């Protein structure tokens, strides 16, 4: 079986979606080795191709990187127009799995996609008009044409049924995995003092303003390290006392900041899954996490849960996590062991084989 796997989002420095795409492809390649042909495909720019090839390093798959000028505009027009099937650009395939933003037309074979979350439909006020428009088009196309829709949590699966009207038999839950670099052993970041850390794109949904308010109430003397680069919308004021803005941190460096922290705080109002929670647990840091049910599967019973809109509750949660440090580290580490990219790849391959 020939499986074409769209990796176009790897054209940019990796954040959550890119990490999922790379990890799920690596897991698929692992379980399909010797049985099926896996092709990583990306119609992208010359600069994007460099990012893609760097991200694919170490994954044993065929690379089919097609370079276009004005690649983003081309992909958007191609997806919306629905002409020129993907077979015009890549050899015939049995499965086409596309990831995010692009939804290429195809002539034959199993059609598969990934739904990371439905924020543009559920909470349109937390997205840009461009994001709402493109994702709404992708969602409609996926609901109408896809044989398989993978989701990263049961929560997102229920949302997909409810908001897109997709029957449960077309939906598969493929949980993300934890890369081996996220482990308790290894270097720790030294920021000159004890700190709490949060890892998030700086945008309204991530709720950094409430976390900053909680930080001002925190009686434990921790600095607040903020990892993440600006997203859209009003930006939080990171110039306060004992706030350490770190900007974008590459994936290879991120475990150091988890390991060095006294606590990881994830105050997000909504997530498709919440991978930063599991990464932090795998590195042995106690976690304080929003009580929104979209984060339940990432947390299990291994985190302190708090009202994301209550600064006092977040501050109290940090105190509880510090008091229960050893217990939460043990619970979190055990919980994180249940998330592997091999298991994610096995879920995908089983579905592809059944549908082909």
Where are these regions (language model features)?
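Carbohydrate transferase catalytic cores enriched for Leloir-type hexosyltransferases
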Residues: 1-356
């Amino acid at each position: 079986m020939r499986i074409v796997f769209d990796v176009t989002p790897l054209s940019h420095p990796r954040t959550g979606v890119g990490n999922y795409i790379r990890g799920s492809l690596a897991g698929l390649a692992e379980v399909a080795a010797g049985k099926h042909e896996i092709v990583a495909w990306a119609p992208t720019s010359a600069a994007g191709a460099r990012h893609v090839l760097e991200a694919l390093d170490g994954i044993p798959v065929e690379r089919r990187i097609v370079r276009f000028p004005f690649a983003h505009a081309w992909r958007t027009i191609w997806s919306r127009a629905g002409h020129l099937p993907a077979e015009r650009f890549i050899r015939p395939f049995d499965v086409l799995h596309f990831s995010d933003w692009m939804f290429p037309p195809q002539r034959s074979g199993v059609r598969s996609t990934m739904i990371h979350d439905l924020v543009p439909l559920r909470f349109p006020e937390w997205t840009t008009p461009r994001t709402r428009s493109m994702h709404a088009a992708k969602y409609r196309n996926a609901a109408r044409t896809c044989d398989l829709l993978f989701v990263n949590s049961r929560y997102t699966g229920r949302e997909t049924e409810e908001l897109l009207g997709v029957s449960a038999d077309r939906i598969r839950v493929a949980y993300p995995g934890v890369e081996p670099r996220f482990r308790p052993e290894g270097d720790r970041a030294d920021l000159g003092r004890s700190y709490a850390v949060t890892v998030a794109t700086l945008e309204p949904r991530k709720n950094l303003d409430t976390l900053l308010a909680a930080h001002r109430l925190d009686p434990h003397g921790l600095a607040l390290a903020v990892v993440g680069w600006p997203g859209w919308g009003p930006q939080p004021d990171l110039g306060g006392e004992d706030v350490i803005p770190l900007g974008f941190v590459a994936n290879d460096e991120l475990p150091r900041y988890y390991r060095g922290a006294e606590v990881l705080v994830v105050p997000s109002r909504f997530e498709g899954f919440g991978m930063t929670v599991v990464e932090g647990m795998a590195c042995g840091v106690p976690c304080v996490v929003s009580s929104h049910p979209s984060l339940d599967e990432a947390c299990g019973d291994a985190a302190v849960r708090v009202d994301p809109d209550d600064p006092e509750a977040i501050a109290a949660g940090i105190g509880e996590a510090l008091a229960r440090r050893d217990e939460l580290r043990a619970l979190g580490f055990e919980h994180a062991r249940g998330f592997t990219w091999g298991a994610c790849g096995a879920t995908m391959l089983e579905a592809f084989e059944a549908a082909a």
